[in-house]
A protein has these predicted regions:
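Thiamine diphosphate
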Residues: 1-157
């Protein structure tokens, strides 16, 4: 699903100059591919989740369509921005989380936690989507870039 996500996002960014992607220390070598083609609209904050979401909020408030990408549980490192701005102020940031169910269960203790998606869903005002097919994923991405609300998109490994 991640490959399909990045392939389709690449296509969407080629058609819409208002779409940005913020990588949060994840996504190589796709980051390099995006940076080469969309240098001013591709950002990598490395392990700075709070910074990534703060940048996403600012870009979104200036009219840009912003995707962020990291491993799902890492979004909790930016909980303050998610709660105070993205959720409370309904800033339309599209948070994409890699890993669902047991995708990262063999990696380490902090990259996998079955409660993370459910906890993120509990934040008021952030609808969450769990596409299972490439058709569902592409359709949901097309819908999300047209919406003016925040969202979370879960991507299987």
């Amino acid at each position: 699903m991640r490959r399909i996500f990045f392939d389709y996002l690449y296509k969407l960014m080629g058609k819409n100059k208002d779409i940005y992607i913020i990588f949060v220390g994840l996504g190589y070598p796709r980051y390099k591919e995006f940076k080469k083609k969309f240098s001013t609209r591709t950002i990598n904050t490395e392990a700075a989740e709070q910074t990534a979401l703060d940048i996403a909020v600012g870009l979104s408030m200036s009219g840009k369509i912003v995707f962020t990408y990291t491993i799902t549980p890492f979004y909790w490192r930016a909980a303050e921005t998610i709660r105070n701005y993205i959720s409370h102020e309904q800033i339309p940031v599209i948070m994409c989380g890699a890993g669902r169910d047991n995708d990262y269960s063999k990696e380490d203790g902090y990259s996998h936690d079955a409660t993370d998606i459910q906890s993120l869903m509990a934040i008021k005002g952030i609808p969450c989507f769990f596409p299972d097919t490439k058709q569902e994923l592409r359709k949901k991405m097309r819908e999300l870039i047209k919406k003016t609300i925040p969202s979370f998109l879960s991507l299987r490994r």
